[in-house]
Structures are given as C-alpha cells and as structure tokens.
From Swiss-Prot:
Domain comment (free text): Consists of three domains: the N-terminal catalytic domain, the editing domain and the C-terminal anticodon-binding domain.
Role summary: Catalyzes the attachment of proline to tRNA(Pro) in a two-step reaction: proline is first activated by ATP to form Pro-AMP and then transferred to the acceptor end of tRNA(Pro). As ProRS can inadvertently accommodate and process non-cognate amino acids such as alanine and cysteine, to avoid such errors it has two additional distinct editing activities against alanine. One activity is designated as 'pretransfer' editing and involves the tRNA(Pro)-independent hydrolysis of activated Ala-AMP.
Similarity comment: Belongs to the class-II aminoacyl-tRNA synthetase family. ProS type 1 subfamily.
Oligomer and partners: Homodimer.
The enzyme's E.C. designation: 6.1.1.15
Main location: cytoplasm
TM stretches of this protein: none
Entry-linked NCBIfam families: PRK09194.1, proS_fam_II
GO biological process: prolyl-tRNA aminoacylation
Protein name: Proline--tRNA ligase
Coiled coil feature spans: none
Amino acid sequence: MITRMSSLFLHTLRDDPADAELASHKLLVRAGYIRRVAPGVYSWLPMGLRVLRKVENVVRREMDAIGGQELMFPALLPKEPYEVTRRWDEYGPELFRLKDRKEADYLLGPTHEELFTWLVKGELNSYKDFPKVLYQIQTKYRDEARPRAGILRGREFVMKDSYSFNMTDEGLDESYRLHRKAYQRIFDALGIEYVICYATSGAMGGSASEEFLAVAADGEDTFVRSTESDYAANVEAVVSIPPAEESVEDKPEAVSHESPGADTIETLVEWANEAGLTVDGAPVTAKDTLKCIVCKVTRPGEDEDGNPYAPELTGVLVPGDREVDMKRLEASLEPAVVELADDEDFKKYPFLVKGFVGPRTFADNDLRMLADPRVVKGTAWITGADEKDRHYSNLVAGRDFTPDGYVEAAEVREGDPSPDGKGVLTLSRGIEIGHIFQLGRKYTEAFDVQILDENGRRTVPTMGSYGIGVSRLLAVVAEQMHDEKGLRWPRSIAPYDVHVVIANKDEAAGEAARELAEALSDAGLEVLFDDRPKVSPGVKFKDSELLGMPQVVVVGRGFAEGKVELRDRLNDERSEIDYADAVDVITKAARA
C-alpha cells in the first residue's frame, strides 16, 4: 500500500512543545504522531495510530502463541466487584469514580482483575475447563496527580492485561513462566534494552512479582543491579541486610545530654564530637545517630461509623546517615497513604519536639513505631530525647525502646551490599514497561470461585496477572532509539517500511519515483510517498529524518545517471544504488 504525503493528515512542527521535557514527548508531538487534548490525555493521529496498532500486534502475536484468548471488557465498570476486593477504597484518589443519573457508583477501569475473576466464576465450573489464559488490549484510566512525559505517564493509556487461571500452584508457576518468556520475546522484537527486576506487589496483592524496566536515564523508576550476580530489583523491593543482634546486658546506660541547637543530623554529629562522645573509640558519624521521622498513615476505607479513617501518627526510625525514601516507605505500607507530619501537626501534638524527636515518645503516647531493619536488638544510638536541645547517647534497641515492626524506608545507595550476598549494588534509572504477578487465590477467594476437581471436590483456582503498557512501549522505543535528527523506528513497528522522497523537479524523475513507490508496494511493502509538489527538498529531508522510517529512498540529482540514494535511518548510513536494482535492494533490507 502507498500513502501519499500530499493527502496525508500530517503536520510536523519545527519547535518543541512548551510542556515537553523528554525527547520522546517532544519528537512524537513534533512529528505529528500525537496531540495533547488535556493534561495526561492525548489523541492518536494517523501516523501514531499506525505504530500503536503494530505494537499491539506484536503483543497479540506472542499472547496468542502461549494460548491466550482475547476478549474485551467495558471501560465503564460498576462499583460492586471492586468493593468485594476492597480496591474501591484501596486505589485511593487515582481511581476515576463517577455516578450515573440514578446515583449509582461506577468507575473507569484502571485494571480488570475483578472482572476477569467474575467472568470465570460465572462461566466455568469444572477442572476440565482449565487452565485458561484470557487477555485484552484496552484503554485504562488512572487519575494521575501529576501527568507528565507525554504518553509515558498519562491519565488514559492503552494496556494489555492478561490473567491465567489454574487449578494448582504448579500450574500457576508454568503460566507465569510462559508469560515471562513471552514478554522477553515482545521486548526483544521491539529492540528495547530492558532489565527484569524483583518488584513489590502493591495494591495488586499476591506473592511473586517482577517488573520489566526499560533502561532510560530520565526514567522515573530506580532499580539496582549486583556487580557479581544476576540480582536486579526495583529500589522499592530491595531488602536491607540487618546486622546480627547483640546482647543488651553489657551495654552502658543511656545518658541524656544538653545539645543546644543540634536539631539536624549534621549539627548533632558536630555537637557529639565537640562533647567528646565516641563510638567504639572512634569519632561519631551520622551512621551512629538515629533519625526519627513522624508520618501520618491513612488506611483506605471507612470505620464502623462510615467515616473515612483518620490519619494515624507513626514513627519511622532510620539510621541518621540515610534519607527516607518515600517511595520505599509507601510501597512498604501500601495500600495506606503516607505523608510526612507538617508544622501544624507539631503544634497540635506538643510531645513531638521538632528536631529532637526520639523513639521513646512513640511508645509513651501509644503511637506505632516502625524501624529500619538495621535498628536491631542491641544496637546503640544517639537520638532525640523529646525535649528541646536534648539528646540521648547509648539508647539501645530492645532495651530502651522496641519497634512495633520493621519497614523498608531508608534510601538505597550505590555500593550497598547486594541482598543475595554477592557483590554490591549499582543504581540505574528505568521506565516500567511490564509487570507480572502471581496473585494466588486473593481474588478467586474474594469472589468465592469454586471449581469441581477431578475427585468432585470444590477447589479454589489460582491466578496470575500480567500487564504491558502498550502505548508506553511506543514512547519507550522513541526514547531509546531517537537521535538528534528525530525518531528512528525499528522495522517491527515502523509506520511504513520505506519512505520515498521526490527531490528533483524533473518530470521524468517524478514519474520514476511514482513507479518505484508502486513497485515497492506491489512487492508487499508499506510505502510513505512524499509527493508534495510545493515543498523544498530540504524540508522533505528534515521531515524524513523526523518521521523516522527505517529506510528512505531519494530520487534526486543522481537520477540522471540512473542512481537513487538509499538512507538507512537506523544506522545513519547512506549509499547510492542503481534505480533498476532499488526494489530488490530495499525489499531485501526490509525483510531482513
């Protein structure tokens, strides 16, 4: 097929959009692939839609290959299934909620575990119906607080979500393995550089969870890799290695000191050394201090009176040389919402002395206290004494204070020991493109799905959930593969196989270009033909670089000698070939 640019609905832009920061966002808008409608909401124009459909087909091919069956649920969903799993509340403000004219509650689907489980409950009843893999490719909705980066982080996006249903845990393991391999084939086909990482399950629940992260310097996710093993994890899933517990019997008693003005870790360390305090004979460092962070943790849902749960003050203890990573803390406490206490909270609760909060105040006031795994029994700390200008030294965990639990809240650093005991961690940035979960029986039990097994006994099947951000994949390819001139699409998803450009006003050259485009189309290639009569060769060349087809053939000055120029956009190489050989050369390259 041939698409003529003289009639194509396409308008390229010279300047970057004002709200764009990432290269993929800038180029997809400038090249006329997408257009912004509202914050986080974009229209797909003809060129962009062609790429999106091709990405969908790559995903669909691999899902079908592992026995997946495609269906389609509505995007507008009733409240009731999401109440069964409590996710109507747990999703929090990201869930688009609405009412119809009869005041019935609905939502715009962010993901469809409930609907798939509901469907299986109503349609299947025998072990002979299993295993099953069902999937859809559909638009999803999430009310992002800060939509950004174009289609990478929007409020409306296209996603493939699939669900496996098995009678046994061993069957779930196999379905999970098949999806993992299928995802690798999908991302390999698109030429994406990615890493498979351990991940948290979040509001999805379940046990095993892995993310596929595309490597990107400007990605919003941080992940780690070990220098001496295959270990890789999203930073939110990294488990700290605690030191060995120590006896509290031989520890010196805690001492309260005057510490005027020592209301930060930096000034606390400075004061401690000036006061002559030491740790095992060495000067005090930030690592010897204990930072006590005050948070407000709000559970989703309502209390017995039907009121939203009130925020609960919670103490979070981390070594003083570490900053609190709010993403790690939030992931540890999901689905609760976590906020740092503000000045109003310190005024409201006088037992919280800003800059001098210590662990004892949480126990004395019946507040929950969570600690970093490094705050183990027998470790001694310099920390706040809950009075202005006073600190404790030798405050010992397990003797002077005891955490109610442990939480991963401290930042992960380059050089930290790898959780698998092999090497140290390096940090990189990435963009999540896929996530796979072993959900187990969380949803099937919630919906009371009962299937008769081979012995006639009722059994609850087990589930897996597997997501790919389809529209996000398009942006990731643009982010990883662009150059300073524009987009560079891999052959698997390029809008067209070849871009034919007339760069010669000679009528014979123009006719030859038209014949070449038709011959390439007859050979089975998808051809973009720049036949715009009043556009200069320079503008045509710039547009060809911006649009990013893998091959560009220019019928220009060399045509008088029977030559055309072939440009390989992926490798940025140019060569002259005989016009008579052009169809064979281009077709062979397109099918390589």
